[in-house]
């Protein structure tokens, strides 16, 4: 009995501390300054670790930026410039060497598939999963790493799991209870309160530090919020500062339980992407939703898949065909404190969350941008590209014309043929001034992309 009493006392003390120091302040959007102190200590520690690594590295070794860590030393000049020597003379067998070189470079390291793996770090952040490129480890640095493991797994992980369990449980229970009320302004207010409070608690479970910029441009009711997509926690990041109606794929498991509870309290739209009827129904419901200026803004990720936060890939045009005002949002994570990217082909949702909860913290910047509308004579594809460009510039991300669906699908033959035509024009000397891809050559499907997608669980 004494052992049981001790466990009960320890558990009650733990929950009391968590509730009073973290849970209640986070529920009201307040901070006692604990996370700020933690981040200052963490920044100083990582700066010290970087200096130790630099001292231990050979003089000829220089820490490179992520952009320069590629396997291949590429010629950055335009392809047409490289082919200038081919023009004005007859074809020779050696002319194919240039294209063979480019083809081999694409096979070894293309600019697309590397966006579906974690971003390389400039310096080690004392996490075992990111020390592949860093081998100059001193005894002092090893001791600090061991202490970091103890802190992350013996203190932070139990704390974060506790907060996540409380946040998810309150979300399911709260939305289920609110869903029993008749439609009214009171129900809407309670629904927004439950969503906002629970999302804030869940963000605290990740030691989230979020910096919101340009809050005067926050998405308004009746509008559509579009953002670049890195992880499922993008939803939590945005929902901590405002409520949204979400569009997404139906899931099973824990995600499915959360979805079914949430839709009772708020008009979220869940659908089966494989069902054509569902896709048409979603488009219809979205148009009806934005027509009502009293409803929450819709949250959509037009890329349709998670990208590693170094670039923005093709936006599907479906989100830009339904009309309404688009509110672009750029999200940029700091990988030095933890990798927010979800590589769904390698990790299921539970494994991903455990990796996040055993990282140092999730630090990110969110930029709200001025609302954008479709201009006269502008089609949906052009509008989507314009919004994508604005997000890429604001977030400091690389803009790519490629479809994120290439993560799992093969390149279509029509696109290969288009590239062959472009190359042939360049060889004969009547090609375009540059090899910049025209967005019209890239297949751009029309279905809206969800906030919760059909990633592997």
Swiss-Prot record:
GO terms for cellular component: endoplasmic reticulum; endoplasmic reticulum membrane. Its EC number is 2.3.1.15, 2.3.1.51. It is a multi-pass membrane protein. It catalyses: sn-glycerol 3-phosphate + an acyl-CoA = a 1-acyl-sn-glycero-3-phosphate + CoA; a 1-acyl-sn-glycero-3-phosphate + an acyl-CoA = a 1,2-diacyl-sn-glycero-3-phosphate + CoA; dodecanoyl-CoA + sn-glycerol 3-phosphate = 1-dodecanoyl-sn-glycerol 3-phosphate + CoA; sn-glycerol 3-phosphate + hexadecanoyl-CoA = 1-hexadecanoyl-sn-glycero-3-phosphate + CoA. One of its GO terms (molecular function) is glycerol-3-phosphate O-acyltransferase activity. Signal peptide: none annotated. Residues 429-457 are annotated as: Disordered. The chain crosses the membrane at residues 14-34, 137-157, 161-181. The modification Phosphoserine is found at residues 68, 77. GO terms for biological process: CDP-diacylglycerol biosynthetic process; glycerol-3-phosphate metabolic process; phospholipid biosynthetic process; regulation of TOR signaling; triglyceride biosynthetic process. The keyword tRNA processing does not apply. Pathway: Glycerolipid metabolism; triacylglycerol biosynthesis; Phospholipid metabolism; CDP-diacylglycerol biosynthesis; CDP-diacylglycerol from sn-glycerol 3-phosphate: step 1/3. Pfam families: Acyltransferase. It is found in: Endoplasmic reticulum membrane. Keywords: Acyltransferase, Endoplasmic reticulum, Lipid biosynthesis, Lipid metabolism, Membrane, Phospholipid biosynthesis, Phospholipid metabolism, Phosphoprotein, Transferase, Transmembrane, Transmembrane helix. Residues 431-444 have a biased composition (Polar residues). The keyword S-adenosyl-L-methionine does not apply. It comes from the Eukaryota. InterPro entries: LPCAT1-like (IPR045252), Plipid/glycerol_acylTrfase (IPR002123). A motif (HXXXXD motif) lies at residues 229-234. CDD domains: LPLAT_LPCAT1-like (cd07991). Converts glycerol-3-phosphate to 1-acyl-sn-glycerol-3-phosphate (lysophosphatidic acid or LPA) by incorporating an acyl moiety at the sn-1 position of the glycerol backbone. Also converts LPA into 1,2-diacyl-sn-glycerol-3-phosphate (phosphatidic acid or PA) by incorporating an acyl moiety at the sn-2 position of the glycerol backbone. Protects cells against lipotoxicity. The HXXXXD motif is essential for acyltransferase activity and may constitute the binding site for the phosphate moiety of the glycerol-3-phosphate. Belongs to the 1-acyl-sn-glycerol-3-phosphate acyltransferase family. This is Glycerol-3-phosphate acyltransferase 3. It comes from Rattus norvegicus (Rat). The lineage of its organism: Eukaryota, Metazoa, Chordata, Craniata, Vertebrata. The gene is Gpat3.
């Amino acid at each position: 009995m004494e052992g049981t009493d001790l466990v009960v006392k320890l558990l009650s003390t733990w929950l009391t501390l968590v509730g009073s120091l973290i849970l209640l302040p986070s529920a009201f959007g307040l901070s006692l300054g604990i996370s700020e102190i933690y981040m200052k200590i963490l920044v100083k520690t990582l700066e010290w670790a970087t200096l130790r690594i630099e001292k231990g590295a050979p003089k000829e070794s220089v820490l490179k930026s992520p952009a320069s860590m590629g396997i291949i030393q590429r010629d950055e000049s335009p392809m047409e410039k490289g082919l200038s020597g081919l023009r004005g003379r007859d074809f020779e067998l050696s002319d194919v060497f240039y294209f063979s070189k480019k083809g081999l470079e694409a096979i070894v390291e293309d600019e697309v598939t590397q966006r579906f793996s974690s971003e390389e770090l400039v310096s080690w952040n004392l996490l075992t999963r990111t020390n592949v490129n860093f081998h100059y480890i001193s005894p002092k640095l090893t001791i600090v790493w061991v202490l970091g493991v103890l802190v992350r797994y013996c203190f932070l992980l139990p704390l974060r799991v506790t907060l996540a369990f409380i946040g998810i449980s309150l979300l399911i229970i709260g939305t289920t209870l609110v869903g029993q009320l008749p439609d009214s302004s009171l129900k809407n207010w309670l629904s927004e309160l439950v969503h906002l409070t629970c999302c804030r608690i869940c963000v605290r479970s990740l030691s989230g530090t979020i910096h919101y910029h340009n809050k005067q441009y926050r998405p308004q009711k009746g509008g559509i919020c579009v953002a670049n997509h890195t992880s499922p926690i993008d939803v939590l990041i945005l929902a901590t500062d405002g409520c949204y109606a979400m569009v997404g794929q139906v899931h099973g498991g824990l995600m499915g339980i959360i979805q079914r509870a949430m839709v009772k309290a708020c008009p979220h739209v869940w659908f089966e992407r494989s069902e054509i009827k569902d896709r048409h129904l979603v488009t219809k419901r979205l148009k009806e939703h934005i027509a009502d200026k009293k409803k929450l803004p819709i949250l959509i990720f037009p890329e349709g898949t998670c990208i590693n936060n170094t670039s923005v890939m093709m936006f599907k045009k479906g989100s830009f065909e339904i009309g309404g005002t688009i509110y672009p949002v750029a999200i940029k994570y700091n990988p030095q404190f933890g990798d927010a990217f979800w590589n769904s082909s390698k990790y299921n949702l539970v494994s991903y969350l455990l990796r996040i909860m055993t990282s140092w913290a999730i630090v990110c910047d969110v930029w709200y941008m001025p609302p954008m509308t479709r201009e006269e004579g502008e089609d949906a594809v052009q509008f989507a590209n314009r919004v994508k460009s604005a997000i890429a510039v604001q977030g400091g991300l690389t803009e790519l014309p490629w479809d994120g669906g290439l993560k799992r699908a093969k390149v279509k033959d029509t696109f290969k043929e288009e590239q062959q035509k472009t190359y042939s024009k360049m060889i004969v000397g009547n090609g375009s001034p540059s090899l910049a891809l025209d967005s019209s050559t890239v297949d751009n499907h029309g279905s809206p992309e969800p906030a919760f997608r059909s990633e592997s669980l």
